[in-house]
Amino acid sequence: MRLSPHEQERLLLSYAAELARRRRQRGLVLNHPEAVALITDHILEGARDGRSVAELMVSGREVLTRSDVMEGVPEMLHDVQVEATFPDGTKLVTVHDPIA
């Protein structure tokens, strides 16, 4: 199987998000990379499902709460920006203050 660098990055991100989901289900709090992976995966999958940029900007803030992440992570994470592929093309989705 040959993957482009872009496809490799998406695959790695998807795996990181899945690992974060499993850790969260076990009751562990997530670190910064895990939180970013989970939010990013939510946006990419939402775009694939046909949701709008506006919807994803709102729902991206509901993926994690302060109790889901390690202390200090919400303060380190001001924005998450993702280039996602929508049915009508690639768009930049920005989620401001993603962890409430």
Swiss-Prot record:
InterPro entries assigned to the protein according to its UniProt record, in alphabetical order: Urease_gamma, Urease_gamma/gamma-beta_su, Urease_gamma_sf, Urease_subunit
GO biological process: urea catabolic process
Keyword annotations: Cytoplasm, Hydrolase
Broad enzyme group: hydrolase
Location (main, coarse): cytoplasm
Locations listed in the record: Cytoplasm
Record-listed E.C. numbers: 3.5.1.5
Coiled coil location: none
Annotated Gene Ontology cellular component terms: cytoplasm
Pathway entry: Nitrogen metabolism; urea degradation; CO(2) and NH(3) from urea (urease route): step 1/1
Subunit structure: Heterotrimer of UreA (gamma), UreB (beta) and UreC (alpha) subunits. Three heterotrimers associate to form the active enzyme.
UniProt xrefs under HAMAP family: Urease_gamma
Listed name of the protein: Urease subunit gamma
Organism of provenance: Rhodococcus jostii (strain RHA1)
